Curated annotation (Swiss-Prot):
Keyword check for Acetylation: no
Biological classification of the source: Eukaryota, Viridiplantae, Streptophyta, Embryophyta, Tracheophyta
Cell location: Membrane
Protein name: LEAF RUST 10 DISEASE-RESISTANCE LOCUS RECEPTOR-LIKE PROTEIN KINASE-like 2.4
Lipid bilayer topology: Single-pass type I membrane protein
Length: 617
């Protein structure tokens, strides 16, 4: 015999008993339209609906939502904040939510939004301007400096120049004149955040007649806001069938509701237990304890935090990073991992378990995680200045002060020292590179992206790897060739050394001035020794002795760290001492003898993507 599941049986009884009840009281919903939508300082009636106003009370496309006392409205698949509503003139001021944080993003993540002309008219006090990214720059267009992009061009006309590869349109006051505010992005951002005003195309006379006849205004179609009058009150008498259905439904309502609630709670608990069990099957016991202590978010909460994943700030090999805001107003970065069906989420487990055991000024702070089936996300603090690789390019690094570069290198060293020697469980990162070093407002570095990390007891000095991991150019020789010894925390030391040489510009010089050298030079810059003998410190010619001392110290530390043999490299606590100590105490490290197998075959199966996860302005 076939048995209905308990949930189906309960629902069947529920809908059977209440079949006549909606028919008996459907007209009563019309009385609910007297109520107003309330959210923060926004009060709205017809043609809006939402909250305690059912859909019948408004236009299908004008549903208002309230979250944290902020009213929002979806127009043409774009979310807008409703800043104000003027019922006298049927106008409202709206602002696109994806413009509220910043319009200086690379690449442009924005798409043009079209307002339905049957419903909205933009007030004549506003106009549309188009923002472009043009290569080469068009001289006739006003340009504004953006930290993450370089420059943005603005035009009043909507013609698309051929050389402009990215564009989107914003609505701003007609008083805005691009040429008069040249190079001042602040005024443009302010005008965009203040939103723009639109008028609803409502037949005001018809609605006034409804009010005078003690009726309320309704709509007749889906797109045009054609109105008609509807009664506010119910008929006073119900049929006997309706009365019986109503009494029966009301009598059994508490029992059915209680049954449904108990069933849902049991089902949800079973589902959660199964999901947690699936996760725990692949996590060692020490890591489970670390996960339990973290705040766990539901996937719906993650969607609210990221405003339905509105703003992308970074992309990498393991997922996409979105900008988000917690309920207390804190800005966060939310990394949503890619489909994990094939690897049981080991990258997710590595990152969460590793970051959950850290607390250091130079390690990015983990705030929580989400794990619902194959939907997994990591929430951590947001770094306004993005990743280090954007600051050590040939153009930007030449303008940075040597003390700033030294502070960044020292901060990363302290962070790695903490991972190797300061944690209860030693953490080896395995993917130290500029893209995985984030910078806060004060250019203080924080190590991030622990997707390839491994945890081991501090007494263990050797790690066993089933696969080679890291990014080409930063991988220690022993990781892909056991000729050089065993893999250990010294592998991070090598990656740090290459990072330091990147900071002082050594990698750029290698690619431009040493193209005729052997392929092994991409792992060990042989030419640096020659420059040290000549007195050149590898980045630029400095005039002050203090800067010259900093440059030489960073160069020597970098060379010690990238020694091919792990035993010849200093541990990270010794690296910090070298960075903080006197230059005179540092010796020039011996020139290494590289083995032929130092350059591996570039197999994508073990190379992490270069575009790792990072946040941007």
């Amino acid at each position: 015999m076939y048995y209905l599941p308990s949930s189906c049986l309960v629902l069947f009884l529920f809908f059977s008993l209440f079949y006549h009840l909606p028919c008996a009281s459907s007209k009563q919903t019309l009385g609910w339209c007297e109520s107003q939508f309330q959210c923060g300082n926004i009060t709205a009636g017809f043609p809006f609906w939402g909250g305690n106003r059912p859909e019948v009370c408004g236009h299908p496309l004008l549903e208002l939502h309230c979250l944290d006392n902020i009213t929002s409205l979806t127009i043409s698949d774009h979310l807008y904040h409703v800043l104000s509503i003027n019922h006298t003139y049927n106008t409202l001021r709206v602002a696109r939510t994806d413009f509220l944080q910043s319009i200086c993003l690379s690449p442009f993540p924005f798409a043009n939004a079209t307002l339905p002309p049957e419903i909205f008219d933009i007030l004549p006090t506003y106009k549309s301007v188009t923002l472009y990214r043009c290569y080469p720059v068009i001289p006739d267009l006003a340009r504004y400096g953006c930290p993450a992009i370089g420059s943005v061009s603005v035009s009043d006309n909507l013609e698309n120049p051929v050389s402009c590869e990215a564009r989107f349109t914003v609505n701003i006051p007609t008083s805005f004149v691009p040429n008069e505010k040249r190079l001042n992005i602040t005024s443009l951002v302010r005008d965009v955040r203040n939103g723009f005003e639109v008028r609803l195309r409502i037949d005001e006379n018809s609605c006034q007649e409804c009010s005078s006849s003690h009726k309320y205004c309704g709509f007749t179609g889906t797109l045009p806001l054609e109105t008609k009058c509807r009664p506010l009150n119910l008929p006073t008498r119900l049929s006997s069938e309706a009365k019986i259905a109503t009494i029966a439904g009301v009598s059994l309502l508490p029992f059915l509701v209680l049954t449904l609630v108990v069933h849902i709670i049991r089902k949800q608990k079973t589902s959660n237990d199964k999901g947690q069990q699936d996760l725990k099957e692949h996590i060692p016991k020490p890591r489970i304890k670390a996960l339990i202590q973290l705040k766990q978010y539901s996937y719906e909460q993650v969607k609210r935090i990221t405003n339905s994943f509105a703003e992308v700030v970074g992309r990498g090999g393991f997922g996409i990073v979105y900008r988000g805001t917690l309920s207390d107003g804190r800005m966060v970065a939310v990394k949503v991992l890619k489909d994990l069906k094939g690897n049981n989420g080991e990258d997710f487990i590595n990152e969460v378990a590793s970051m959950s055991q850290t607390s250091h000024v130079n390690i990015v702070t983990l705030l929580g995680f989400c794990s619902e089936g194959y939907k997994r996300a990591i929430i951590y603090e947001f770094m306004e200045n993005g990743s280090l690789d954007k600051f050590i390019s040939s153009k930007k690094s030449s303008t940075m002060d040597w003390r700033e570069l030294y502070g960044i290198a020292l901060g990363v060293a302290r962070g790695l020292e903490y991972l190797h020697h300061g944690c209860r469980t030693r953490i080896v990162h395995f993917d130290i590179k500029p893209q995985n070093v984030l910078l806060d407002d004060n250019l203080s570095p924080k190590v991030s992206d622990f997707g390839l990390a491994k945890l081991c007891e501090r007494k263990e000095s050797i790690l066993s790897l089933m696969d080679t991991r890291g990014t080409i150019g930063y991988i220690a020789p022993e990781v892909f060739s056991r000729v050089y010894g065993s893999v250990s925390h010294k592998s991070d030391v090598y990656s740090y050394g290459m990072l330091v040489l990147d900071i002082i510009g050594a990698r750029n010089k290698t690619s431009t001035e040493d193209t005729t050298s052997s392929t092994s030079s991409m792992y060990f810059p042989e030419w640096i020794y020659k420059d040290l003998e000549k007195g050149d410190n590898g980045r630029l010619i400095v005039n002050r002795s203090e800067e010259d001392e900093i440059a030489k110290k960073m160069t020597l530390v970098g060379l010690w760290c990238i020694q091919p043999w792990p035993l010849d490299r200093p541990a990270m606590n010794r690296v910090v001492e070298m960075m903080e100590g006197n230059l005179d105490a540092l010796e020039v490290p011996p020139r290494p003898v590289l083995q032929c197998s130092v350059v591996p075959h570039l197999d994508s199966s073990w190379i992490s993507e270069e575009n790792s996860i990072s946040s941007e302005i």
